[in-house]
A protein has these predicted regions:
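A short, conserved alpha-helix in the catalytic core of glycosyltransferases
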Residues: 4, 9-28, 32-60
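Membrane-proximal envelope and lipid/glycan-remodeling enzymes
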Residues: 26-31, 52-54, 70, 77-83, ...
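Intrinsically disordered, low-complexity regions
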Residues: 4-5, 16, 74, 110-114, ...
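Active-site-adjacent helix/loop segment of glycosyltransferases
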Residues: 44, 48, 52-130
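Residue-level signal for well-ordered alpha-helical scaffold segments within enzymatic catalytic domains
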Residues: 21, 25, 45, 90, ...
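Membrane-interface aromatic/basic loop that binds lipid-linked glycans or pyrophosphate carriers
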Residues: 122-149
């Protein structure tokens, strides 16, 4: 068991504390992230500035996650999966060294269409929404990449 303060690669954004000057110096939050991966992005930017992400052993943080105003389960699944994948694409696109991983996910686009079809036939509607959300995230990210070129 580890004890004492240690340097870590990433930490949960809900538990981060910065001096205001340092937070401004790293460029604040990237507004292109919906909610996911913003903490990973902050940690990456901290390391780029030759600073450290330190986990303080004695610290305690309670993060009440999972509280959502969206009551419709299908809408909740769609929003979670769609924005999770979009944020994941954005994070890996920014980090440059994950191009192969991004390509593998984008290549799954046609597989998602097949899975949507079979999930419809078997009446697994939550899966239909799940795969549709991921499919639309891929389409949206492809449009984003086209605008950049």
């Amino acid at each position: 068991k580890l004890e004492g303060d240690i340097c870590v690669e990433n930490t949960l954004g809900a538990c981060m504390f910065f001096k205001k000057k340092d937070f401004i110096d790293i460029g604040l939050f990237d507004e292109n992230f919906f909610i996911f991966f913003s903490d990973d992005d902050l940690c990456r930017k901290i390391k780029k500035k030759n600073k450290y992400v330190i986990q303080v052993f004695e610290s305690k943080c309670i993060h009440s996650h999972g509280i959502s105003k969206v009551k419709n389960i299908f809408e909740k699944i769609y929003l979670r999966e769609h924005y999770y994948l979009l944020d994941k694409f954005h994070y890996f696109h920014k980090s440059d060294n994950h191009k192969d991983m991004m390509k593998n996910i984008i290549d799954k686009k046609n597989n998602y269409l097949i899975k949507i079809f079979f999930s419809l036939i078997t009446m697994r509607f939550k899966k239909v929404v799940y795969y549709f959300a991921r499919y639309t995230a891929i389409l949206k990210f492809n449009n984003f990449l086209k605008k950049l070129s």
